[in-house]
């Protein structure tokens, strides 16, 4: 209307092809990340079996196990007891990272604490293999236990630690530095 010349430059076939290839690669990468192995390790702390309340403590533990099983069913995982107070859940990264499932996990943790006065510490690990995911979950659980608070930490396949989940301020940092100067210093020591 103002007399300016307008020129329409349609994208070339090559640019369209490159854009579609890039989109396809991004989708494949995201799908691969969500298909990674995930392991969650639940550990009951502050759990004391008293002789005078032997049966009531067994019933409380059974109620907690039911809740953990319901959570595991919701994420379509598999659960295994490991010792008296530890449970290992195998799933995929997509299910574990989903915000809805993380809220369910936080609610489970809160419910166990309020109803049974038992802390439920959780370590989550993801990785290319179940072994790598479990090692990451163990490290995350150790960090949770070290803080002596009821918290959830997660270590991903890239060795980045996230947490505590569900808190207003969540930290995210690399456990292994990629800085060449720091790597050189660590090799010398």
Model feature map: region roles:
Residues 16-24, 134-145:
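Two-component system phosphotransfer/interaction surface
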Residues 1-84, 157, 161-189:
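Interdomain helical linkers/hinges and coiled-coil/dimerization scaffolds
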Residues 91-115:
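GGDEF/GGEEF active-site signature
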């Amino acid at each position: 209307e103002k007399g300016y010349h307008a020129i329409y430059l349609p994208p070339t076939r090559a640019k369209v092809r490159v854009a579609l290839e890039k989109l396809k690669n991004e989708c494949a990468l995201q799908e691969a990340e969500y298909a990674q192995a995930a392991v969650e390790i639940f550990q009951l702390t502050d759990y004391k079996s008293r002789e005078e309340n032997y049966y009531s403590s067994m019933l409380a533990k059974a109620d907690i196990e039911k809740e953990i099983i319901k959570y595991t069913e919701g994420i379509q995982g598999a659960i295994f007891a490991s010792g008296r107070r530890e449970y290992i859940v195998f799933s995929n990264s997509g299910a574990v990272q989903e915000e809805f499932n993380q809220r369910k996990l936080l609610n489970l943790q809160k419910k166990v604490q309020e109803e049974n006065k038992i802390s439920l510490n959780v370590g989550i690990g993801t990785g290319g293999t179940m072994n790598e995911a479990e090692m990451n979950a163990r490290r995350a659980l150790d960090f949770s236990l070290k803080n002596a608070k009821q918290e959830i930490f997660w270590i991903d396949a890239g060795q980045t630690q996230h947490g505590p989940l569900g808190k207003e301020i969540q930290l995210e940092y690399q456990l292994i530095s990629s800085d060449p100067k720091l790597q050189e210093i660590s090799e010398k020591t």
